[in-house]
């Protein structure tokens, strides 16, 4: 019995060490092709970033982010939770670097507005509705830094713009996790003239996704879930920290008859839970291509999208 207990304790310590020291710093780039553009459209390269949860001292993460500009994306989409510290805005801006010169859109999440706090981990499973906010974060400074470089704030607005010769009609909401979403401010049919109709939200709450789908959006990008952060082999994400089902905790899926969803597993963690297991931190390069003339089968997964991962 003593030997068994010692082995179990040793395995637990090793697992925690791996999750906290190795995997959470093993940044990966996923590449995914999604057929969502109107027929006849040329491909569009979209870099999806989310949940940086940046601390000023996280040099490895900052250096990895700076290299992503070499991917030459046409558009950057940032789905929030950039900050984990009052003084992290300069670190985020410096890490994004030349990506801020690429056309971009963004919305904020709870950890752009409020600093993280220690939380009971069982709340993620049994008390998801409870919200514990930390001190206010300098989100106004972050928004100013993004918009001054040309990124578009999508919080409760609809915008139409051109990227790489394609017309994009985008709309976004404030963080549904904080109940800040006001979809009625952007409600209405998506533009029929656009090559891409894009919805942007931090937390992929089903009630928001349903509204985007009902308005005819082709693609919604979201973050928040961290891909589950702690996943189990052959089971997947233990929790999503929202009302989205576990099977959609990260990656591409079909939502309704005509809309695709992509949820980023994100690049960071709360400083009070600095672990990842079977869920590497990631950025995703989405190659959006023209959809076939006939729509996908209702209820199908995004089976045409085959992700590949590489470390950069």
Task: Give the residues covered by each predicted segment.
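Active-site environment of divalent metal-dependent phosphoester hydrolases
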Residues: 54-59, 83-87, 111-117, 154-164, ...
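Binuclear metal-dependent hydrolase catalytic cores centered on His/Asp/Glu-rich metal-binding motifs
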Residues: 118-151, 155-157, 163-210, 273-276
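Core catalytic region of metal-dependent phosphoesterases/phosphodiesterases
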Residues: 60-162
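N-terminal active-site segment of His-dependent metallophosphoesterases
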Residues: 12-95
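Active-site neighborhood of phospho(di)ester-bond hydrolases with catalytic His/Asp-centered motifs
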Residues: 48-50, 75-81, 103-110, 154-156, ...
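Acidic, His/Gly-rich catalytic cores of divalent-metal-dependent hydrolytic chemistry
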Residues: 9-29, 255-312
């Amino acid at each position: 019995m003593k030997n068994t207990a010692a082995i179990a304790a040793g395995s637990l310590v090793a697992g925690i060490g791996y999750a906290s020291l190795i995997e959470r710093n093993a940044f990966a780039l996923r590449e995914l092709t999604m057929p969502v553009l109107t027929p006849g459209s040329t491909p569009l390269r979209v870099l999806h970033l989310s949940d940086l949860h940046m601390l000023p001292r996280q040099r490895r993460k900052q250096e990895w982010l700076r290299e992503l500009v070499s991917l030459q994306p046409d558009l950057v989409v940032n789905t929030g939770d950039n900050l984990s510290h009052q003084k992290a805005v300069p670190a985020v801006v410096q890490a994004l670097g030349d990506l801020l010169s690429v056309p971009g859109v963004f919305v904020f999440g709870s950890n752009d507005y409020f600093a993280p706090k220690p939380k009971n981990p069982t709340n993620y499973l049994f008390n998801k509705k409870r919200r514990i906010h930390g001190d206010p974060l300098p989100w106004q400074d972050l928004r100013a830094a993004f918009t001054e470089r040309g990124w578009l704030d999508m919080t409760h607005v609809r915008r139409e713009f051109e990227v790489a010769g394609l017309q994009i009609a985008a709309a976004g909401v404030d963080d549904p996790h904080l109940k800040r979403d006001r979809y009625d401010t952007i409600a209405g049919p998506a533009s029929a003239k656009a090559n891409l109709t894009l919805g942007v939200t931090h937390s992929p709450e089903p009630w928001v996704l349903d509204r985007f789908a009902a308005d005819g959006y082709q693609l919604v990008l979201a973050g928040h879930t961290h891909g589950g952060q702690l996943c189990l082999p052959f089971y997947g994400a233990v929790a999503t920290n929202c009302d989205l089902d576990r099977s959609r905790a990260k990656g591409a899926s079909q939502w309704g008859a005509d809309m695709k969803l992509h949820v980023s597993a994100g690049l960071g963690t709360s400083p009070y839970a600095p672990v990842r297991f079977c869920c590497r931190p990631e950025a995703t390069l989405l190659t959006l291509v023209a959809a076939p003339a006939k729509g996908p089968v209702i209820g199908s997964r995004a089976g045409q999208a085959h992700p590949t991962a590489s470390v950069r």
